[in-house]
Amino acid sequence: FGYGHRYVECLQDFYKLCGKTPLLPRYTFGNWWSRYHKYTETEYKELVERFEKEEVPFSVAVVDMDWHLVEDVPPVYGSGWTGYTWNKKFFPNPPEFMDWLHKHGYKITLNVHPADGVRAYEEAYPRVAEKMGIDPASKEPVLFDMTDPKFIETYFEELHHPMEEEGVDFWWLDWQQGTVTKVPGLDPLWMLNHYHYLDNKWKGTRPLTFSRYAGPGSHRYPVGFSGDTVITWESLQFQPYFTANASNIGYG
């Protein structure tokens, strides 16, 4: 309200106050392939080869949540919404698969819903539990808690870094579990965006995360996505308008 129709000046002052949007890696400006589908390694490779044959350029391979165990999670542990263990029925050799994608010019992002923490069926559970001071034999879950520095350290060092060393370039944070933490007013999505962006620098490359809007200041942790949509022409027509309007608070 203080700027009238001086929109550009308003945004310039907003950036001065809240920080500028960091430069993105060059590959992010290419086409991304993303489909909610239970891909197998073979099917994904066939798709990439078809893109190459048809001369359809892509720079990012997105693998949605079925890269990890979902339906095969024992019922005692709840749903398979959260997961960090590759589904070897679909991807029998994850490092080889990601190396193949890299050789074909793709960067790789995996979808994660981290809210359920780490449960005893996960391959990483023993080392995560030990680091958190939990006896692995107890099968006690490691609860997700972005207010706990020890959990944050373990979360990155034991869950994400090993898979990044195998080939994951950045993470698609698909947080949908609310805004409440042990600290009043602290949004877990804000913490996830902040720490994932900072942590993505560890390999010496230009950092990137792929996540939802977590409030003013989210432009400092690019890049964002709209959230779930419906498959209709009306929805597709709305998306450019919706995306362009996000720039009113620097987000994109």
Segments from the language model and where they lie:
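Catalytic-domain carbohydrate-binding cleft regions of carbohydrate-active enzymes
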Residues: 1-252
